[in-house]
Curated annotation (Swiss-Prot):
Its cofactor is Mg(2+). The gene is aroK. Transmembrane segments: none annotated. This is Shikimate kinase. It comes from Coxiella burnetii (strain RSA 493 / Nine Mile phase I). ATP binds at G15, A16, G17, K18, T19, S20, R123. Substrate binds at D37, R61, G83, R142. HAMAP family: Shikimate_kinase.
Amino acid sequence: MKKNLTNIYLIGLMGAGKTSVGSQLAKLTKRILYDSDKEIEKRTGADIAWIFEMEGEAGFRRREREMIEALCKLDNIILATGGGVVLDEKNRQQISETGVVIYLTASIDTQLKRIGQKGEMRRPLFIKNNSKEKLQQLNEIRKPLYQAMADLVYPTDDLNPRQLATQILVDIKQTYSDL
């Protein structure tokens, strides 16, 4: 089946640069950027931490699956996904079939620095006292799933979001001439 190339999906762990790069991709392509976690918060009127607290991870993942399904039906979007989106097989399938999947990677130290700068220590799966260990654990579980989905992979440790977004677009156009 031919891949639908109208959407660009950014996957990777928290702090990998998905939203920063996505914002630049949206500007360069004049497309709308969606952040799946922010869209869930808008729809529910509650933040992700509250959803995790009240509904548990299973409740959040159900909401995430519904949001991914809705967003994958849109055309010509940039989507910065939540780090755990790859844990659900249906999410992986929908994302893979409806766009180009960009996997952004970063070292654990870079992720910790970025998460700390954004004041995002409140993330539900981010345990402040064991943050480095938690990120390593999440990476071990999710990395094979990210790699299996990825059409293109980019390290973001030395991130200049605009330069990286420009390179991603060049690479997409070289790889997929009909985008």
